[in-house]
Amino acid sequence: MVMYPENFGIIGENPELKAMRYSFITVGIWWMSFSQYTFYFLPDQNERKKIIKDVVWNGFKELVEVWNELKKIIIIKKYLIAFFIYSSALQTVLLIAAYFGEQEINWPKDEKTIGLIVSILLIQLIAMFGAIMTSKLSEKFGNIHTLILLNIIWALLCIGGYFITEPIEFYIAAAFVGLIMGGIQALSRSTFSKMIPETDNTTSYFSFYDVSQKVSVVFGMTLFAFVDQITGSMRTSILVFVFIFLIGALLLKRIKIKNY
């Protein structure tokens, strides 16, 4: 719709902008329509629980309690530190990829928008195959070894990103990103699930995992912006994450491989 608005009867001034607005509506209709299946078949929670005023504060207290428990389990503590480090680079690269492509790639006239859309679609499509490939690698070599390998590949991608200037190079990089993006995210989560103790309160543990991931984004984006501000170069900022991924790989190497 955005790439070829005239095929959808969208004409006039700035048809691409109009098409983008319409696309938001169609996506909303898509989610509303297909979510009905879930709403219909999921069991209905009839029990109504009273909303407590201190629910947010209690959530923070629960996270602190989980952290105190996790600190006693050395292997999880080591893993979460490694995860925080490489996740800060991973999430930041994913967030700024489109902006990097817009600012740093020499797109032909009137092809920038289409090129960025194609790149995003390419990443999403290939991510499925990447997740399958990562699953096979983890079965053969173990989760930790596979995560170390993926961190090294990410570091190499960041080095390659420093030299990318042409659209074809950006497409190739996007394909590699898709290949390892879904895999490292899924494998990181499954590795954490293997490490947590047997408990009925797994939700709290994964809540802490998710909070760690969100905080890592803040750290990564702050680091990226700081380097970009000092050097005036987005490419130099990308190079910083080479070291972040390598540090993540080294921290993962400290974890005993048994059962992981």
Regions found by a protein language model. Give the residues of each.
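A membrane-interface helix-boundary motif in multi-pass transporters
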Residues: 3-28, 226-245
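Multi-pass alpha-helical transporter architecture, strongest
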Residues: 30-41, 184, 236-260
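Juxtamembrane intracellular "pre-TM" segments in multi-pass secondary transporters
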Residues: 43-80
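Short amphipathic helix-loop junctions that connect adjacent transmembrane helices
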Residues: 95-114
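Helix-to-loop junctions at the C-terminal end of transmembrane segments
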Residues: 129-143, 228
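Structural signature of the two symmetry-related core transmembrane helices
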Residues: 145-160
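Helix-loop junctions at membrane interfaces in 12-TM secondary transporters
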Residues: 162-174
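Intracellular juxtamembrane helix-capping segments at the cytosolic ends
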Residues: 183-197
